[in-house]
Amino acid sequence: MPVWTDAAQCKSTMVLALNDWWCRMGGPSIVPDRSAVDPLELKALLPNILIAEVEHDPFRVRYRLQGTKVTEITGIDITGHYLDELLSVEPDQPWQEHYLTVYRSRRPLFGSTTVPRSAGGTVDYEFGIFPLRRGGDLVEQFIALEDYFGLLGTIEQIEPWRVRSR
């Protein structure tokens, strides 16, 4: 599925709103600090937001928070799980590489993907992944958003991700 770095290619008003916030908080060459995340300012976006933290060596992504809409649509709460522990229903979507790209570039990455629905058929959604600092200069966290374009959804509307067996 396609990914891009130019926010102008986004169709999602929610992804664009988070991009506007990110640019306003950081500026053209500065990654915003996690302390700038104000839930009241981002209230309309919160159900679709994910916050993840970075482990640097080796590079790993651990989800700290997942919005209620993401849980409702995906059928799984990935809070507390590492990305590499999860089995995506989108084998062609290299999520780990997307986060690594954002980590290295210190810039947002946008994209769209298609996932299977539990009842058959597919759902398209758009996403944005944005880097955050936490007091220093290193990228320590990510704030991401998934826009399901008005999909009402119930639990397991799309095929859920699964935690890998150990």
What are these regions (language model features)?
Residues M1-L86, Q93-R166:
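Intrinsically disordered, low-complexity terminal regulatory regions
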